[in-house]
Swiss-Prot record:
Meiosis-specific component of cohesin complex. Required for the maintenance of meiotic cohesion, but not, or only to a minor extent, for its establishment. Contributes to axial element (AE) formation and the organization of chromatin loops along the AE. Plays a key role in synapsis, recombination and chromosome movements. The cohesin complex is required for the cohesion of sister chromatids after DNA replication. The cohesin complex apparently forms a large proteinaceous ring within which sister chromatids can be trapped. Forms a heterodimer with SMC3. Component of a meiosis-specific cohesin complex, probably composed of the SMC1B and SMC3 heterodimer attached via their SMC hinge domain, RAD21 (or its meiosis-specific related protein REC8), which link them, and STAG3, which interacts with RAD21 or REC8. The cohesin complex interacts with the cohesin loading complex subunits NIPBL/Scc2 (via HEAT repeats) and MAU2/Scc4. NIPBL directly contacts all members of the complex, RAD21, SMC1A/B, SMC3 and STAG1. InterPro entries: P-loop_NTPase, RecF/RecN/SMC_N, SMC, Smc1_ABC, SMC_hinge, SMC_hinge_sf. GO terms for biological process: meiotic cell cycle; sister chromatid cohesion. This is Structural maintenance of chromosomes protein 1B.
Length: 1248
């Protein structure tokens, strides 16, 4: 047998580009991590072997192209090729290509159709439909759990007997139709034969009409013989029917007993499953109780974590705000530093300019000492002359300077105030947004809270009602249990009572409107104190059966005889001799009439009570009863409450313990009602317990309500604080800043106006001073060549003053900037300290949150574990409930079967009673006929016996049963000679014909002279009718023969198809059933292991299931479901290998068949596969267990690589270079795998 050499895949599923997988050895294992694409090798082999797309884990064929599952296929086509090499060395190539949403098939290099492709695969032993070389993942487990019918379908696929199913069903239907047609034509032929017989009789009557005169002498004999003949024939028929009916009744009773046994077994199973369900429910309740404790802890931990997270978010927000303010502060500091730098540069530039100007002016004007003295003298004159004006001018200048400084200060205040106002407005907007969010959150919380409170109220009300109802139910149950315990009645009936109850039920079903029941069940005393007295007086009638009529009572007695049941007393309403009631007895004091202390719901039964009780009286004490019974002028029947009875005859009968036990039967009905009430209350209590479990939901809702209330309270407090405190403060500050801005604006305006007015005054004083100076310095100015003295002073003296002034302003401005810079830096330092403090708080908060989250996760883990356990128990509970429901359904089905069979028994018993009545009536008719012969001296010939043996008394249906039985037994010994009876009279078929002839003979006997005149004229056309009927009979016979021939041909055709299907199936089944035991022994490495297949239908095994059972080594026989997972897997593998041996493929591919095997079974299975791969066929196995694939001849490793999507790579390793020396030594206890520790990388010298 050849072998698979290589597998070539191109852009198939996880294989990108063209990949070469192989070469494959006799025993090759494919290994790799999960998700690497190992199963895609299996899919590639399935694909190239013609498998349908639906079995390849995709919806359409284009999804098999690499990258298609991500929406980015790398190509529009993909292909898979296998290279198969025959033993002769011939190489065969099979290729399947995906192109344009369709498959193309190539054998060798030529495209072929699918049918040719499949045929070429079958030539090398691969059957596509049977999948005889592929075992997919999970198939082994599914094979071990197959139902017998599914296993049969599996065998039909392997044996190809399923190909005959259509033809088999068609031939079978055709055969059934042909047989129905043949039966129909047979019935037609039978009816025509009856017509022909009837026509013959009419012809015989016509012929006998001529001889009627001769037969008048023997008319009485003929009449008697005729009656006796058909009476005896009817008796024989009835006896035969009675025997047959008794046989049928026995069979049906056996069936009833069988179904009743099944019903009892099912009820026993139902009780066991119910106890298991109760235990599981108890366990579920325990888990739910623990869950109810842990869930609030988790909710509390979650709320605590949420609260700390909110505080952390608030701290982070404060850090963000502080960081923004720090950023603004830093920008301000940088601006101040830049301003200081600019100020220093400006000062240095100014000093440089001043030095240059001084040098220039020194060159322009140079005064002599005399001129300088004269200048000082003139200057002193001017000072004295304008001293007052100078003082006023200086005063104005100082005031103006002060006002300018105030104006500059107010402008700086204006800028700072505007900045603060802008910041206040931003904070107001932020708080408004925060208010909106809080109001929205508050509204959501209130809506949620209202909803939860409604749910809480509803649940509280429901639970309170449930608890109240549970209390009431428990009280009622307690009372009922006490009553049942106080009753102390042994209610378990014996077999005798059960049999009597069953007989009564049968009678009620036979006569539903006529059998009322036992007297005990139809009435009861008006008070418990009368129970003993009523029981004593009723006596044997207490369990008597009340029926409607005497006839029904006799039918019931016959039924009891037929059933060999115990004798029963019957009270027929139309047969009772009822004595009138003595109304005067009601007037006697100290007693009551017995009929007055008994009540019934059925008015027609009062006659029965009157018959049983008569004029009996009931008294309180024994003395009163004795006095009333014997103390008066006439004796009366009286009974005391303790059961002591005084009869008219003087007999006194006392009460007894047996009487008390009998009297307890009156309580049976009440106890039955109490048990029904108890069952209803127990069921209601179970439902209430289910409702009470909602307390868990109530606690959860209460916890949620509490958490929501807390969050709502925090939100409302924060909202109120923002509205009433923060926002009001900001608005107040905004108002203050706005009013302050207005004040500053008005101050600036006023200061500007004052400065302008002062400037005007300064200019006026300066003009006056200038005029004085001009007058005094006029000559001096002309001498030095200047226009006026101010020009000289501006160039020399004034310049120095201006320089001093400038220096003073520079120093003031620099001082101000330094102060402002230091203040800003202090503020920045404070904010940074705040940020550090907040960061420390956040860090600590994060640590707290981590701890809280850890606590929360622990709580959540516990809750989730409990919930998982709860769900698992619920699943078990659901499974048990489902099993109970199934058992309950089966019990109901068996109950229906029992009732159906019981109805059938009742029906058959009724028919038996009817037949017995008819038989007794016929025996009575025979006796009266023989008696008539004896009395009227009708000489009938007797073969055995004599008419003298007939007792000369006429029997009726009311005679004693024993007497009639003796008479009938004597008459049965008399044998009558019916040879004188005409043959035509013996040949009558229907009862109607018998009655007609009987009437005819009676008329003939009654009127001998007028017989010819009164007899109906015969059918004169009987001969023609007979000819017509004979032609019709011949035609129906021909049609019947044709239909019977057609049915025979259909039977032959059906048997041929049946034989072909049976042969195909049996050939496969016999081969597998023989080889599976040897394979299982080899797999288990033990000859004591057994595996066997057995068909449920040996004649046609493909119509029913096939059972598969294995006996593991060292274990007793048990069903397949009770085997362990590893044993099931080995059994399934044995079946797979046995099936494969029937239609062996050149190679066998299995996907993770070792998944359910333990180490021991892995060693056995791998050793067996090793042997088979060397001797029989090539094995390719996908495996994840090193203990398994270490036995292989070669390994193919599959590993994934991820780029845009995952794609697979392949490595190969030849293990034949590493012999398994441990196997040769036979060491099995501590075996290590022989896989060498080599690097499985593309650069490895062993890799391909």
């Amino acid at each position: 047998m050849g072998h698979l050499e290589l597998l070539l895949v191109e852009n198939f599923k996880s294989w990108r580009g063209r990949q070469v997988i192989g070469p494959f050895k006799r025993f090759t294992c494919i290994i790799g991590p999960n998700g690497s694409g190992k199963s895609n090798v299996m899919d590639a082999l399935s694909f190239v072997m013609g498998e349908k797309t639906t079995n390849l884990r995709v919806k359409n064929i284009q999804e098999l192209i690499h990258g298609a599952h991500t929406g980015k296929p790398v190509s529009s086509s993909a292909s898979v090729t296998i290279i198969y090499i025959e033993d002769s060395g011939e190489e065969k190539t099979f290729t399947r290509i995906i192109r344009g949403g369709c498959s193309e098939y190539h054998f060798g290099d030529k495209p072929v159709s699918r049918s040719v492709y499949v045929a070429q695969l079958e030539n090398i032993g691969i059957i596509v439909k049977a999948q005889n070389c592929l075992v997919f993942q999970g198939t082994v487990e599914s094979i071990s759990m197959k139902k017998p019918k599914e296993r049969t379908q599996f065998f039909e696929e392997i044996s190809t007997s399923g190909e005959f199913i259509g033809e088999y069903e068609a031939k079978k239907k055709k055969l059934q139709k042909a047989e129905e047609d043949a039966q129909f034509h047979f019935n037609v032929k039978k009816n025509v034969a009856a017509e022909r017989k009837h026509a013959k009789i009419e012809k015989e009557e016509a012929e006998h009409y001529q001889n009627l005169l001769e037969e008048l002498k023997i008319n009485k004999i003929q009449l008697m013989l005729f009656q006796l003949y058909y009476n005896e024939e009817k008796i024989n028929v009835l006896n035969t029917e009675l025997e047959q009916m008794d046989g049928n009744l026995s069979v049906v009773k056996d069936t009833l007993s069988h179904h009743e046994n099944i019903f009892k077994a099912k009820k026993k199973d139902y009780g066991m499953l119910t106890r298991q369900l109760q235990q599981t429910a108890k366990e579920l309740k325990s888990v739910e109780a623990i869950l109810n404790q842990k869930r609030p802890q988790y909710i509390k931990a979650k709320e605590n974590t949420s609260h700390h997270l909110k505080k952390l978010d608030l701290s982070k927000k404060l850090i963000t705000d502080n960081e923004k303010q720090c950023s603004k502060q830093e920008d301000g500091i940088r601006a101040l530093v830049a301003e200081l730098a600019d100020l220093d540069r400006a000062w240095k530039s100014f000093e440089k300019q001043m030095e240059e100007k001084i040098l220039q002016k020194g060159r322009d004007i140079e005064l002599e000492n005399s001129q300088l003295d004269r200048y000082k003298l003139l200057k002193e004159q001017v000072r004295r002359k304008v001293g007052i004006m100078t003082q006023q001018l200086e005063k104005l200048q100082w005031e103006q300077k002060a006002e300018k400084e105030r104006l500059a200060f107010e402008k700086r205040r204006h800028g700072d105030t505007q900045g603060n106002l802008k910041q206040i407005k931003e904070q107001i907007e932020e708080h408004k947004k925060r208010i909106e969010k809080l109001e929205e959150y508050t509204k959501t919380c209130m809506d949620c809270l209202e909803d939860k409170k409604q749910q809480e109220e509803a649940l509280k009300k429901e639970i309170e009602n449930t608890k109240s109802r549970m209390s009431e139910v428990n009280e009622e149950l307690s009372l009922i249990r006490n009553e049942l315990q106080n009753a102390g009645i042994d209610n378990h009936e014996g077999k005798r009572q059960q049999k009597r109850a069953e007989v009564l039920e049968h009678l009620k079903r036979l006569y539903p409107d006529s059998v009322f029941g036992r007297l005990l069940d139809l009435c009861h005393p008006i008070h418990k104190k009368y129970q003993l007295a009523v029981t004593k007086l009723f006596g044997r009638y207490m369990v008597a059966i009340v029926v409607a009529s005497e006839k029904i009572a006799k039918d019931c007695i016959r039924f009891l005889k037929a059933e060999r049941a115990e004798p029963e007393t019957f009270l027929a309403l139309d047969y009772l001799d009822i004595k009138p009631i003595n109304e005067r007895l009601r007037e006697i004091k100290g007693c009551k009439m017995m009929i007055d202390v008994i009540k019934t719901q059925f008015p027609q039964l009062k006659k029965v009570i009157q018959f049983v009780c008569g004029n009996g009286l009931v008294c309180e004490t024994v003395e009163e009863a004795r006095h009333i019974a014997f103390g008066g002028p006439e004796r009366r029947k009286a009974v005391a409450l303790d059961g002591t009875l005084f009869l008219k005859s003087g007999v006194i009968s006392g009460g007894s313990s047996d009487l008390k036990h009998k009297a307890l039967c009156w309580d049976e009905k009440e106890l039955h009602n109490l048990r029904d009430k108890r069952s209803q209350l127990v069921q209601e209590l179970k439902e209430l317990m289910k409702t009470l479990r909602k307390e868990t939901d109530l606690k959860q809702i209460q916890t949620l309500v509490q958490g929501t209330n807390t969050r709502l309270k925090y939100s409302q407090n924060e909202l109120e604080m923002i509205k009433k405190k923060h926002l009001a403060t900001f608005y107040r500050e905004q108002s203050q800043l706005q009013s302050e801005l207005l004040n500053i604006d008005s101050q600036c305006t006023m200061l500007s106006e004052g400065i302008n007015k002062q400037q005007q005054k300064i200019e006026e004083f300066q003009d006056k001073i200038d005029e004085v100076e001009d007058d005094i310095f006029q000559d001096f100015c002309e001498e030095i060549g200047v226009e006026n003295i101010r020009e000289f002073e501006n160039k020399h003296v004034k310049q120095q003053q201006e320089n001093d002034q400038k220096r003073l302003e520079f120093e003031k401005q620099k001082t101000r900037l330094n102060i402002q810079l230091e203040y800003s830096r202090n503020q920045l330092k404070k904010k940074l300290n705040n940020i550090d403090t907040l960061k420390t708080t956040i860090q600590k908060g994060k640590e707290d949150i981590d701890n809280l989250k850890k606590t929360e996760e622990e709580c959540l883990k516990i809750v989730e574990e409990l919930m998982v356990k709860q769900e698992q128990i619920k699943e078990v509970l659901a499974t048990q409930s489902s099993n109970i429901e199934k058992i309950h359904i089966q019990i109901e089905e068996e109950r229906k079967k029992v009732l159906a069979v019981d109805r059938e028994v009742g029906k058959l018993q009724k028919e038996v009673v009817i037949i017995q009545g008819s038989l007794e009536q016929k025996l009575l008719e025979k006796h009266n006929l023989l008696l008539d012969c004896k009395v009227q001296d009708i000489d009938i010939s007797l073969v055995l016996g004599s008419l003298e043996d007939i007792i000369e008394m006429e029997l009726t249906e009311t005679e004693s049963t024993q007497a009639t039985a003796d008479i009938y037994e004597k008459e049965a010994s008399i044998q009558i000679d019916y040879s004188p009876l005409r043959e035509d009279l013996k040949a009558l078929q229907s009862d109607k014909e018998v009655e007609a002839h009987l009437t005819l003979l009676l008329q003939q006997v009654a009127s001998q002279e007028n017989t010819l005149l009164k007899t109906t004229a015969p059918n004169l056309r009987a001969q023609e009718n007979l000819k017509t009927v004979r032609d019709k009979f011949q035609e129906s016979a021909d049609v019947f023969e044709a239909s019977r021939k057609e049915a025979r041909i259909c039977r032959q055709e059906f048997e041929q198809v049946k034989r072909r299907r049976y042969d195909a199936f049996s050939q496969c089944f016999e081969h597998i059933s023989v080889s599976i035991d040897q394979i299982y022994k080899k797999l288990c490495r033990n000859n004591s292991a057994q595996a066997f297949l057995s068909p449920e239908n040996p004649e046609e095994p493909y119509l029913d299931g096939i059972s598969y059972n294995c006996v593991a080594p060292g274990k007793r026989f048990m069903p397949m479901d009770n085997l362990s997972g590893g044993e099931k897997c080995v059994a399934a593998l044995a079946l797979l290998f046995a099936v494969h041996s029937f239609r062996p493929a050149p190679f066998f591919v299995l996907d993770e068949v070792d998944a359910a095997l333990d180490n021991t079974n892995i060693g056995k299975v791998s050793s067996y596969i090793k042997e088979q791969s060397q001797e029989q066929f090539q094995m390719i196995i996908i495996s994840l267990k090193e203990e398994f694939y270490s036995k292989a001849d070669a390994l193919i490793g599959v590993y994934p690589e991820h780029n845009e999507c995952m794609f697979s790579h392949v490595l190969t390793l030849d293990l034949s270079k590493y012999p398994d020396t441990e196997d040769q030594e036979g060491s099995r206890s501590h075996r290590k795998p022989r896989v060498p520790r080599v690097s499985m990388s593309p650069k490895s010298p062993q890799s391909r």
